[in-house]
């Protein structure tokens, strides 16, 4: 607890806002492929989407250092969080077929840029002796979101798969965008 309260600077901002990512994306991820199937996307298309997503991540990963150096860590994190998370969440929320998921998968690969810049922000104000604690706090913050998984299950059982997942993607858009603003 003292590590959490003693954080300062960018490390504090990264750790304190990390649960917002978990609360948005971890609720919807277990339903993503089933949602695609419900919209008529075939198994082999889901596999193709996964492959294209990975290729997009490789390309963005290769460019991430240059982009982060050019734009700076904060601006890169803000811009590419919007590109990699907010925009795809909106696309997924209104998705009708394979093509929506394809566009979102390519755009979502940009999270590799944010991962690079965010990791730099996370550690730049943290002393070497505190690094392990900071990474542990980030991991704990992400896992904390698992406590809210029953909310997604309740939404699916109450409203049905398609409307509930669309709502969860809209929720992810709102929370991720708020995380970026904060």
Tell where the protein language model's regions lie, with residue ranges:
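Glycine-rich segments within core transmembrane alpha-helices of 12-TM secondary carriers
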Residues: 136-153
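Symmetry-related core transmembrane helices of the 12-TM Major Facilitator Superfamily/SLC fold
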Residues: 166-182
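Hydrophobic core of transmembrane alpha-helices in multi-pass small-molecule transporters
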Residues: 19, 88, 99-114
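Helix-loop boundary and gating motifs at the non-cytosolic
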Residues: 2-56
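Helix-to-loop junctions at the C-terminal end of transmembrane segments
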Residues: 60-72, 157
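Residue-level signature of mid-helix packing/kink "hotspots" within the transmembrane helices
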Residues: 54-62, 146-147
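Transmembrane alpha-helix termini and helix-breaking/packing motifs in multi-pass membrane transporters
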Residues: 34, 38, 148-169
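Structural signature of the two symmetry-related core transmembrane helices
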Residues: 75-90
């Amino acid at each position: 607890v003292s590590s959490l309260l003693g954080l300062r600077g960018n490390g504090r901002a990264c750790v304190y806002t990390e649960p917002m990512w978990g609360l948005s994306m971890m609720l919807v991820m277990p339903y993503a492929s089933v949602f695609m199937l419900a919209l008529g996307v075939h198994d082999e298309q889901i596999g193709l989407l996964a492959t294209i997503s990975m290729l997009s991540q490789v390309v963005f990963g290769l460019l991430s250092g240059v982009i982060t150096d050019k734009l700076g860590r904060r601006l890169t994190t803000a811009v590419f969080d919007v590109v990699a998370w907010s925009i795809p969440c909106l696309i997924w929320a209104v998705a009708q077929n394979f093509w929506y998921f394809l566009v979102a998968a390519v755009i979502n690969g940009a999270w590799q840029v944010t991962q690079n810049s965010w990791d730099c922000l996370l550690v730049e104000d943290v002393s070497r002796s505190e690094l392990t604690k900071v990474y542990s706090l980030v991991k704990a913050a992400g896992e904390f979101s698992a406590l809210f998984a029953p909310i997604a299950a309740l939404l699916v059982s109450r409203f049905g798969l398609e409307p509930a997942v669309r709502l969860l993607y809209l929720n992810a858009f709102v929370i991720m965008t708020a995380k970026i603003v904060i």
